[in-house]
Structures are given as structure tokens and as C-alpha cells.
Amino acid sequence: MVGFKATDVPPTATVKFLGAGTAACIADLITFPLDTAKVRLQIQGESQGPVHATASAQYRGVMGTILTMVRTEGPRSLYNGLVAGLQRQMSFASVRIGLYDSVKQFYTKGSEHASIGSRLLAGSTTGALAVAVAQPTDVVKVRFQAQARAGGGRRYQSTVNAYKTIAREEGFRGLWKGTSPNVARNAIVNCAELVTYDLIKDALLKANLMTDDLPCHFTSAFGAGFCTTVIASPVDVVKTRYMNSALGQYSSAGHCALTMLQKEGPRAFYKGFMPSFLRLGSWNVVMFVTYEQLKRALMAACTSREAPF
């Protein structure tokens, strides 16, 4: 057996909630530079935005983007928006991942045999619910990642300053900008990510190809990351463009998507695909492996406290 052993007692909702948020924060710490590179590539080609990321630098590929940012803005630029990112994951992942099993059981009325439809419903529900909780943190994270030091001063000096500036200049709605595409994106991402992970893991275990250990979690998470990137990239690009846009630049997320299609063609919807895949693939592996181990460790700790002898 690799890692912590599974306990006879299933993890509680609280353990899943805390475990999911913590695991997502660990995954974000490791993969954040890839996410920043993805954002820069996705907004490249925009004419205007509240944060001008591409005014003095053109980005080519994942490593090219990272190296250009390090050269022109310094290594710390790769972690722009990290605080907001961790705030987002602690509130966001706790809901969309931590509550997934509980919502799935609600839809299946406690049955152990969940259909694909029930899993999709659960993924859509927790994904959309998470946006309602964490949207402002996502807006601030994207704005920080998009802003460049080269060619001018930084618009936001700190995370708190970013929240205040956006609320003052754009109103309360500014903090909830892009909610519609984000709800769509996260319903899709959650379904692709959690349901694919669920199905791959179940298939591997039922076929006796693997046991419920780290290799199984790694394989399932990697497959889920690839499927999620393919399905969610178009919505993710629109979400990023719309949240980073200047006030009045786009009338809606749909207008943003139509403008992209007309000016840049359909390939624009897959801008930043490679960093998206590298980020989502690695993020999924780190998050799911850590999450599975955290659940077991926390339940083992709870069990040992209840029965010390």
C-alpha cells in the first residue's frame, strides 16, 4: 500500500470540505506560474483592457511566456495574484470539490450506485454554487495576473487595494464581472474534472487494474485534467477576456465571444491551450493525490483520537 491506508469509516463532509480547500491551495502554490502564463496568452491580441499585459511584450508558448515575464518583470511576476488565488481556492474548491460527494448522494438518494446523470448534476451544482461564493477572488486574481510592470506602474498595489479599487471604479458589479461565463465554465469544468476522475477511478478499480492507491489517483487525475482542458478551454478564454476587459468594452460575455470569433477566428478560443493543459494536468494530479491522502490522514487522526488504545 502506497500512502495512507483507507479507513473503514468514510470521510465526513467536514473532512472533505477542509481537505479539498487545503489540497487545492497546495496545488495552486505549485502550478501558479503556469496559470499566470495561461492568462497572459489568453488575453494576448485584445485591443484594450483595464490591465495592459501585452503592450510591451509578445508571448510565444508556455516557456517563452514564463521566460519573457521573468526577464521583463522579474520572477515574482509569475506569482501575481497568488494571495487572491489562495483565497479563491480555499472558498471555491472547498465548495465545488468538498461538497461534490454529498450533493451526489443527495441526487442518488443515498444509493451507492450513482449514474452518470447524477454525477453530472452534482458537478454542475457544486461548480455553479462555488462561483456564487468566490467570484470576487477570481476577478482580482485574473486582474493581478494580467497586469505587467513593464511600460508603466502597477494598477493594483495589494490584494485589498485591488478589491477596493475595483469596487470604487466599477461598482459592486465589477467584483462580480464575468459571473455568467464563470458559472458556465465551472459547471463544465466540475463535470469534466470530477466526473471524469470518478469514472476513470471506478473503471480502474472495477477492472482490478489498480488498487485504491497513489498510482490510481495519479492516473485518474491526469486523464481528468486532459479531458477538462479540451472541454473547458473556449469558455475559460472568454471568461478571462471578459473579466479583464475595460468598462464598456464588451456588453456581455456573448459579445466578447462573438468579437473574438470575428477578429481572431475560432483558434482564439484555444489560446493558451498548452499552459492550460500543463496547469490543469499538473494541478489535478497534485490536488487529487493530496486530497485523497488528506482525507485518509484526517480520518485516521479522528479515529485514533476516538480510540487511543
UniProtKB/Swiss-Prot annotation:
Its main location: mitochondrion. One of its GO terms (cellular component) is mitochondrial inner membrane. Residues 41-77, 146-173, 243-268 are mitochondrial matrix. GO terms for molecular function: antiporter activity; chloride transmembrane transporter activity; GDP binding; L-aspartate transmembrane transporter activity; malate transmembrane transporter activity; oxaloacetate transmembrane transporter activity; phosphate ion uniporter activity; protein homodimerization activity. The record marks K141, R185 as: Important for inhibition by GDP. It catalyses: L-aspartate(out) + phosphate(in) + H(+)(in) = L-aspartate(in) + phosphate(out) + H(+)(out); oxaloacetate(out) + phosphate(in) + H(+)(in) = oxaloacetate(in) + phosphate(out) + H(+)(out); (S)-malate(out) + phosphate(in) + H(+)(in) = (S)-malate(in) + phosphate(out) + H(+)(out); malonate(out) + phosphate(in) + H(+)(in) = malonate(in) + phosphate(out) + H(+)(out). Solcar repeats lie at residues 11-106, 114-203, 212-297. Keywords: Membrane, Mitochondrion, Mitochondrion inner membrane, Repeat, Transmembrane, Transmembrane helix, Transport. GO terms for biological process: C4-dicarboxylate transport; cellular response to glucose stimulus; glutamine metabolic process; glycolytic process; long-chain fatty acid transport; macrophage differentiation; mitochondrial fission; mitochondrial transmembrane transport. The chain crosses the membrane at residues 17-40, 78-103, 120-145, 174-199, 218-242, 269-294. Coiled coil: none annotated. Residues 1-16, 104-119, 200-217, 295-309 are mitochondrial intermembrane. Belongs to the mitochondrial carrier (TC 2.A.29) family. Antiporter that exports dicarboxylate intermediates of the Krebs cycle in exchange for phosphate plus a proton across the inner membrane of mitochondria, a process driven by mitochondrial motive force with an overall impact on glycolysis, glutaminolysis and glutathione-dependent redox balance. Continuous export of oxaloacetate and related four-carbon dicarboxylates from mitochondrial matrix into the cytosol negatively regulates the oxidation of acetyl-CoA substrates via the Krebs cycle lowering the ATP/ADP ratio and reactive oxygen species (ROS) production. Homotetramer. Adopts an asymmetrical dimer of dimers functional form. Interacts with MICU1 (when methylated); leading to decrease the calcium sensitivity of MICU1. This is Dicarboxylate carrier UCP2. It comes from Pongo abelii (Sumatran orangutan). The lineage of its organism: Eukaryota, Metazoa, Chordata, Craniata, Vertebrata.
